[in-house]
Every structure is written in structure tokens, then in C-alpha cells.
Amino acid sequence: MSLKQQVDLLPNKPGCYLFFNKDNDVIYVGKAKNLKKRVSTYFNKAYNIKTTRLVREITDLKYFIVDNEKESLLLEKNLIKKYHPKYNVLLNDDKTYPYIIITNQKDPMYKYVRKYDKKALKNYGPLPIGSNARSILLTLQRLFPLRMCQGNLNKPCLYYHLNQCSGACFKQVDPSYYEYQIKQVDKFFKGEINQVKQTLVKQMQKASDNLQFEQAQRIKDQITSLDFITAKQNVDIVTNKNIDVVNYEINQDKICFVILFYRLGQLTYKDEYIQNYEGQNLSELFNSYLQQIYQKNIYPDVLLIPNEIELLDLDQNLLEFSSYSLNKQDDVFIKLAKQNAIDSLNKSVISHNVNSGDEIEILEQLKQISNASKYLKRIEVFDISNIYSQFITGACIVYINAKPIRNEFRKYNIDPSYTSDFSRMKFMLEKRFLKQIKEKEQLPDLVIVDGGIIQIHAAKEVLNKLNLKIDVIGLSKDDHHKTRYLIDIFEQTIDIKNFKKLYNFLTSLQIRVDEYAKSGFRKKYHNQLNDQILLIKGVGKKTNLKLYKHFKTIDNIKNASFDELNKVINNKKITNLIISNLNK
């Protein structure tokens, strides 16, 4: 029976399905509320444009009908565990996060665990990245003692004498004692730790005065761990809820999932997972990723997911706390998770291409496609980044034999008076090549500009002026801001998507030079935040950013009239404050 006939005969019932390849290996396991409807999408011509390798590999399929959602979830989990299909999400079995728990016992105690404990009285976590979880545990044991020993010793234990045990070792402890201590621990993890820090600072000072320097250092480590718990976030969050945010990014043939854990308004943990993407059903992959995450980790109050993921495709137990973005704060969460996924995937692409082992083949193909005149041993790539035409930074990255030479990477400050892409690129390249000529440095065999014809013409003008015979090509992106086209030395546009190794290599160049340039303007921007305007008491970052977005430079702000400034700020008091301070 042909594959199409098998699909046509599938029942309109819930169940699990398995795809097999020519070697009879299971390559994908999925579940569906309607088997026929779901499996048919893989063989639909419109959908099949995206499915590529996965669908091409399918030679056979099998299915199981189930009675309910819970049964299909369990069956899918067991089938994935049994066959390890290469196109499924396969998180490591040890994909767990650090927690501190309080045991659910008559005389509870603290424990550090690497897995959410459903039986525990309290689970605190995942704990912040960079924090020393065991140091936090030690702090809790010392400041809010619970049971520390095995109990029922008929005599006080050593920890009781050190004020680190409730005394369950030799007496009945009033339950109200534990209730009070646990309330203090709750406050502690909500960030109310000023009193705790004061106590620790006093203990550290006392240990230091008594020349107990090792003890003082241990206490200092505890204070550092507390700072991680209450570290100020880049996003101001007002919530008492535990929120997890999941998003994804697809780039070339890879997909990256990122999950951000917010606990009581603090970002405490981030995790990522990258695997091959060959057109698998996105909602299924997303659902499978979430299932595996929450098999061993605590459910949040809210799980935020991107709008394009269908909630109906999620399992019932995930549906109960899953949500799309409902307000501006949710939008910030979703965008932040998206940016993390993009960054993680970009780093993965760069890392993969640094060690690809196909350098000679890639360079030969690049020479051929770009019509370059000689072997491309040394390549220099140029890009420019800015924000609101301010903090303009040019960047040059250098590759020799297709390997990055980081100590030759350079950044160039570009004055805002250069207002066009052409003039900025021309300024940077002129500065670059004049120095190389003067100091007799090695010149590139190929110049690649991140951009189109405008940037290419700027580069050619500089090279002609300096009488340098160096080939110039450009890299441009598609409507989704992904690397797509190469503009060769004759200014012909070539789609490079199908030249996979070359495409991956050029994508990694474009990502790296873009990130390197952005790191320059970010530094300038953060330095600028300490400028004259922000030093004015009562003027914040938002006002500062509005002014620079509109006026571009501090000189333009100083020369603006009251009406011009107030039109941007829309606050007469602040406008007067700025004018009076800048005119001092």
C-alpha cells in the first residue's frame, strides 16, 4: 500500500503516529486529536514546501488510537523514549534546575535538589543563574533554622548548640515555630533581605575582628549569593506571580527554544535547547518541549507562549496555566525570550562554522560564485550600526583561510555628520586602508560589505582612489532579515540559499560583524547615558532617549528653543529644568 493510501485511510480519531524511513527506523513520533487531519498536513503540497528532509525520508507510517488526551500523552512520551526519533525534541534526562525545598514532614528540613519535588512542602526555584545555591542553603540554615539532624536523639545535636537546628533532636517543637520560620523564608525569596544582609554583615565584621578570615570569607560568599537573588533586572516587573516565558527562533535548518523563569518579578533562570528543524509541526515540537520541561520542574502561575502556537494543541495540564500576551508587560517578556532565542541560535551558527572543516571547499565556492579574481585567503567584512543615527560604529572582522582572526577585529567611531550609508562606509574604509598602506599591513583578497549596491559603490570608490585592486562583494538580507543574497563583483545578485555550506559560512560572517558593530554602539550609548542631561536631577532615561532620538546630538539639544524641546518632552517643568542646567 502506498504512503498516500495509508494517509487516506487514517481514522478521524485521537492517537499517536510514527514515521519510518527506508531503514525502518522511527524518525518522528507525534500525537494528534485527529490523526487523519494532522498527518495529512505533512503531505499537503502547500505545507510540504517547508517540510523538506523529514517528508522526503518518510517511507512508512503506523498509528495508535487512544481514548483520551492523557493516554496519548503517556503513549507519545513512551514511544519517544523507546525510539529516540531524530526529528523529535529530545531533552537530556537530566534536564533539571536547582531548587531549595522544605520537606513535608512533622519537623521539616531544608534540602538542595536538582529536580522539582512534588511531595515537598515548599519548592523555591529555579534558583538564579550565577548564584551559589549551596551558599544560599547555608544562609537559610543559619538564619531560619529548621530541623538539621535526624531527630529523636534524646539529646541536643551539635547544630542545636550552633543555633542551626530547631531542637527536634531532643524535644517536641511547636508547629507555630516552623510556620513562622517558613514565612520568613517566603519573604526571603520575595527579595525582602535587607535585615538578613545586615545580620550577615555584622557576623562577617565580627569574624574579621576576631581574625577568623576563612569564616568571614564564607559569610561574604553568602552575601554575594543574596545579591544574585535580588539583582536589579533590565525590565521593571510588578507581579507576585511565578511566570515562565517560552519562545523560539528558526534559522536555516535549526530551531532554538528558550525558556525564561521569573520568580516573584525576578528573572532567576534561563535555559535553551537547539536541534535540527526539517519542517516538523511547530506546535507539536513546542508542545513536546514543554512536556519534557515540566515533567521534572515546577508549574508556574502563568506560562506565556507566542501567539502563533495554537493553545488547543497543548496538553490539558499545560492549558490550565498557558496564556498568550495580554498586555504590554507580557509583550516585553515574549520579545525578550525571542531575542534570547535569536542570540543563542546566532552563536550556534557562528560556533558551527568556526569548526566546520570545509574551509577550502567553501572558499573555492565563494571565489567561483562571486567571480573573484584570486584565491580568497584573507577576507575583511565591514558593517555599520547605529541607534537613531547616533552612536555610529563601524566594524571590520578579518578571516584568514575562513577562520576568524579576533585580534585583528577593529571598530571605528563615525561622526554623526556623516548622514548617509554611502558616506559612512566610505569614511570607514578610507581610514582602514590608509592605515594599512601606511604601516604596510597585509591587504585583503576580498572585501565584503554588509549591505547592497550603495555600500559596494562606496567601497569601490575608496579602493579606486587609493589605486588598490581588491574585489568587492555585498551580502544582503531578505524580508525576514535573514542572509539571502550575494552581490558579486559585477554587481549581479545571486540567491545563495541553496549553496548550504557557503550560505552557512556567509551567514556566520554577517551575524558576527553585525554583533561586533552593535557591541560598539551599545558601549557608546551606555556611556552617553551618563552625559549632561542624565546628570540633571529629575530627568530620566526615557526623556534622555526621546531627546536624542529627535535631536540626534547634545549640541542640537542645547541649541533648541523651549517650544522645540517641550514638543518632544511634553512637560514644561522638565523642559525648563533642562534649559536652565544646559545653559549654566
Swiss-Prot record:
It is found in: Cytoplasm. One of its GO terms (biological process) is nucleotide-excision repair. It comes from the Bacteria. InterPro entries: GIY-YIG_endonuc, GIY-YIG_endonuc_sf, GIY-YIG_UvrC_Cho, RuvA_2-like, UVR_dom, UVR_dom_sf, UvrABC_protein_C, UvrC. GO terms for cellular component: cytoplasm; excinuclease repair complex. Residues 194-229 form the UVR domain. SUPFAM superfamilies: C-terminal UvrC-binding domain of UvrB, GIY-YIG endonuclease, RuvA domain 2-like. Residues 12-89 form the GIY-YIG domain. The keyword Ion transport does not apply. Keywords: Cytoplasm, DNA damage, DNA excision, DNA repair, Excision nuclease, SOS response. Pfam families: GIY-YIG (PF01541), UVR (PF02151), UvrC_RNaseH (PF22920), UvrC_RNaseH_dom (PF08459). Belongs to the UvrC family. Interacts with UvrB in an incision complex. PANTHER family: UVRABC SYSTEM PROTEIN C (PTHR30562:SF1), UVRC/OXIDOREDUCTASE (PTHR30562). NCBIfam families: uvrC (TIGR00194). The UvrABC repair system catalyzes the recognition and processing of DNA lesions. UvrC both incises the 5' and 3' sides of the lesion. The N-terminal half is responsible for the 3' incision and the C-terminal half is responsible for the 5' incision. This is UvrABC system protein C. It comes from Mycoplasma mycoides subsp. mycoides SC (strain CCUG 32753 / NCTC 10114 / PG1).
